[in-house]
Each structure stands twice: as C-alpha cells, then as structure tokens.
Amino acid sequence: MAAPGPASRFWCSCPEVPSATFFTALLSLLVSGPRLFLLQPPLAPSGLSLRSEALRNWQVYRLVTYIFVYENPVSLLCGAIIIWRFAGNFERTVGTVRHCFFTLIFTVFSAIIYLSFESVSSLSKLGEVEDARGFTPVAFAMLGVTSVRSRMRRALVFGVVVPSVLVPWLLLCASWLIPQTSFLSNVSGLLIGLSYGLTYCYSLDLSERVALKLDQKFPFSLMRRIPLFKYISGSSAERRAAQSRRLNPAPGSYPTQSCHPHLTPSYPVTQMQHASGQKLASWPPGHMPSLPPYQPASGLCYVQNHFGPNPNASSVYPASAGTSQGVQPPSPISCPGTVYSGALGTPGATGSKESSKVAMP
C-alpha cells in the first residue's frame, strides 16, 4: 500500500472550511484589500461603510455592504479570524442556505438598530459615533443565538470557566481591542442575536423545506460542486449524520491511519485442551500465567503448547482454576471425567504429536 504524497497529507490535515464562510472572507478581501494595500494613507472614508448621512441620500446598499469594509490591515486580519471562527461554526450548525439567510437578516437589522442609536446619540449630543464596518456585528448576533440555545451551561473563556450566558458580554468587552470597530454596532448585533435566540423573531426563520429547495438552486448548486470547500446541507438529518461521522470516524479515515497498512497480529497461540483435544483459550507470547496444580471438576485437563523452540515439540501444563472455570461452565462434582465444552468426547490419543501428560492428583 503506497503512502500518500505530501500534497494529499497537507489537504487531509487542513480543516474543512464551509462554503459560505469562505466566500464571505473572500468578499471582505476583495472589497477592502485594494484600498488597504494599493492606496497610500491617509485613506478617505469608504463609500460602503454605514452612516446616517448616506441613508439620507438613499444609499440603502450600505445596510449590507458595511460588513465587508475594513479600514486597517489589523482589523482585516481580525475580521478574517472572526469570520472563520464564528461564521464557520454557525454555518455548520444551521446549513449553508440558512447561514446566508441569517447573515443577511442580522446584517440589515443590526444596521437599523445601529442607526436608531446613532440618531438618539446625535439628538442628545452625546458625541460622534464611529461608522459601522466589519463583520463583528453579525458575528455577535450569531454568538448571541448560540449562547441562548446552547445546552452547555459553562464555557472556557481566556482560560477561565464562566457561565455560557456571560460569554457574549465578555467578548463584547474584548472587541474594544479591535481597531476601528464600532462598539455600538457590536451591541446592536448582540441584541438581535439574543432576541432571535429567545424566539422573539421566530417569524423571520427559514423552514427546512425551503432550505432544501434552495439547495438545488443557483448559486448554492454551484457552491455544492466546489470540492475544496464543505457545503453544509439544509437537512438537519444530514448534518447530524455528518457530525456523527466526525465524532466516530471510520477506520483508516485519518491520514495517520491511511498511511500504514492494516496488519493482522499473528501471535503464537498456547492451546488449552481437555483430554479430547479441543482448543479452549489462547495466550500471547510472554504472558503465560503461572499455573499451580489444580484438580478440575471434569477430570484431567492439560495445556499443550505447540509453539516451543521446536515446532514439532509440545509441552503440557496443568490448567489453572481460573482458566478452567472461565472457559467451561461449572460441572457437578459427582460427574468426574465429563467434558462440558459443548461437545462430547472420550479420552484417547491427542494426535500424532508427542506430548507428556501430567495426571492431576
């Protein structure tokens, strides 16, 4: 069996990236990459970020496009990690079609709540609010849904075990460290996720029957044909089966298993026989237990080893009490000489091979 090459081992070791998660990260790179890596700083504000002045000019497309906008290479890197971590897990849970649907819903409603907060802030003269940009509001919405509906009561955050309901709020505080990220938009996304997780937005859900129909339509049918990425079906039964295969993989499915042939162990066998010559048990070499004298209830009992230094030689040992009783059922003492191994036999010659018999006292 030939071992797979380095390229195949590399692809086997790479984690599977869901389709919609990959294309979300790709769109973020295509939208923000040219501005960040081709233009000289200082950069002008992006025409795709979310602000209230843009909606007054009927630029409603900004309600969606702001999640692909990043104004800093560090924020772009953080956004890619957030997309891979949170969006990827959410897509594996709900499927690719519903992931795209909820991404759109969370994006639009987070933007609406953010604009409402911004209007209140401007009317109250509380200060200028930073423009909403990046995927973090949608990620917090997905995190809010997961934290509410998860069966886990505790989670590990930064090496500390905390209740699961506190995880979104702790990560919300940590989002201050991401450069040029609107904290208000993150709060808006988290509120949307918690509202949906508590079934206050059940009317916005997408049924499984509709998701299965959309699986066969464009562009999802095209995404399904791409072998490099994992398309998650809209069927909950298929997702559970895939999760079961991940938890209980078939033998040989891991690269470390498939690189080596399966060897069947061939251990020398120590045979335990009655006077009728029937095989009862086997021991691997070097693990032969000490066999004290024992008088079994069924009469004479021998352990014959045919794998000594000479293949034609054999040696016979008296069987131990635990071995004899563990192999054959208990027999009454009043019936000596009876073999209780499922077959009737009479004491006689054990074969053409020479063997020494030690009579049990």
Swiss-Prot record:
Source organism superkingdom: Eukaryota
Documented effect of changing G189L: Loss of cis-Golgi localization
Region (Disordered): 265-287, 318-361
Transmembrane residue ranges: 19-39, 63-83, 100-120, 158-178, 182-202
Keyword Transmembrane attached: yes
Subcellular location: Golgi apparatus, cis-Golgi network membrane
Result for mutant: G193L: Loss of cis-Golgi localization
Listed result of changing S185L: No effect on cis-Golgi localization
Tissue: Widely expressed, including in retina and brain (at protein level), as well as in kidney, testis and ovary. Expressed in all layers of the retina, including inner segments of photoreceptor cells and ganglion cells (at protein level).
Gene Ontology cellular component annotations, sorted alphabetically: Golgi apparatus; Golgi membrane; nucleoplasm; perinuclear region of cytoplasm
GO molecular function: serine-type endopeptidase activity
Membrane topology: Multi-pass membrane protein
Composition-biased stretches (Polar residues): 267-276, 318-328
Signal peptide annotation: none
UniProt keyword annotations, A-Z: Golgi apparatus, Membrane, Transmembrane, Transmembrane helix
Gene3D superfamilies registered for this protein in UniProt: Rhomboid-like
InterPro entries named in the record: Peptidase_S54_rhomboid_dom (IPR022764), Rhomboid-like_sf (IPR035952)
Subunit structure: Might form homotrimers; these trimers are only formed in retina.
Similarity-based family: Belongs to the peptidase S54 family.
Designated name of the protein: Rhomboid domain-containing protein 2
Protein source organism: Mus musculus (Mouse)
